[in-house]
Regions:
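A short acidic, Gly/Pro-enriched loop at the edge of an enzyme's catalytic core
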Residues: 49-61
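Conserved class I S-adenosyl-L-methionine
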Residues: 89-117
Length: 171
């Protein structure tokens, strides 16, 4: 899903904020790619609320589940606005509280375990935040319709839900 979103973005500089253990920019054709995180195997270790990146310098900025686990997601979005070039692209990946994952989170017995300890952000709220920063939404995609099962067998049995999701459960 993320591979499709970053594959055709043109530019020279791409940055992934957070989750440095995973290379979500692997499908990007942009020549310079960097992972930034406060800890872990990141090429650049930095606080995401205060990026050591020049203003208007990034063509593609990827935020995989960063906002849900931030103390101040508004500040991170302000940094996104600052470092993105004009006509740059930000790909924001979030858990939807109005999904099967959100329902699972609401009834979770272990609330301090990842990803259930995050603050899932509803799409209308995210749209409001982006509008306040005058960031234009040019596209969007929902995904991960399969319920959050622990057993791979159940995940495979429910794989059909991915194809049906956008058609029958639009948000």
């Amino acid at each position: 899903c993320v591979d499709e979103m970053v594959a055709d973005v043109f530019g020279f500089n791409a940055v992934q904020l957070g989750l440095p253990e995973h290379d979500f920019l692997r499908a990007s054709r942009i020549p310079f790619k960097c992972r930034v995180a406060p800890a872990g195997p990141a090429a650049l270790r930095a606080r995401l609320r205060d990026l050591p990146i020049a203003s208007n310098s990034i063509d593609l900025l990827l935020l995989p589940h960063v906002l849900e686990f931030s103390v101040n997601p508004h500040q991170i979005l302000r940094e996104v606005q600052r470092v993105l070039m004009p006509e740059g692209h930000a790909v924001i990946v979030c858990f939807n509280p109005r999904s099967l994952w959100g329902v699972r989170r609401a009834f979770n017995r272990v609330p301090d375990a990842y990803p259930w300890d995050g603050h899932f952000i509803a799409l209308p709220r995210l749209k409001d935040w982006l509008a306040l920063l005058e960031l234009e939404i040019t596209g969007g995609r929902m995904g991960c319709y399969v319920p959050p099962f622990a057993q791979n067998t159940w995940i495979q049995r429910c794989r059909f839900m991915e194809a049906a999701g956008d058609r029958w459960w639009p948000i």
